[in-house]
Amino acid sequence: MINMKIARLVRDGHETYGLIRDGKVATKDNMVNQTGVPLPFSIMDFLFEGWYDEIKDRIISTSFQDKLETFSILNPLPNPSKIICLTFNYPKHAKEQNYESTKEPVIFIKPRTTLCGTNSEIRCPNFVKQLDYEIEL
């Protein structure tokens, strides 16, 4: 099995999605050209309507034509309804903060507006006294 990641990407103002492997990207258009499968425009349709399963065995190494560093990685999903988070999934960090681990997971939600892409700015209002970047991963 080949190890690949799925991502939303933008380059030169053009948004797309693609598969990432070894620092190279197979964009939606690359995959369509290589496989002949008419992939959907939306990453949501690609993920949740079985398209990945349709093409995963057809993807060949020549589909990965573009260097990842030529793209900006966007937040994973456009307009999710909510983000469900789990606290203390980093036990070492909890210990550093002098928090006692709980036996049960602590779950909380965040608004969808808190999502951002890789290397994007994390906005912090002036009234925030402590921003825990490890919680913001």
Describe the residue ranges of each PLM region.
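N-terminal non-catalytic cap/leader segment that marks the start of a structured domain
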Residues: I2-P105
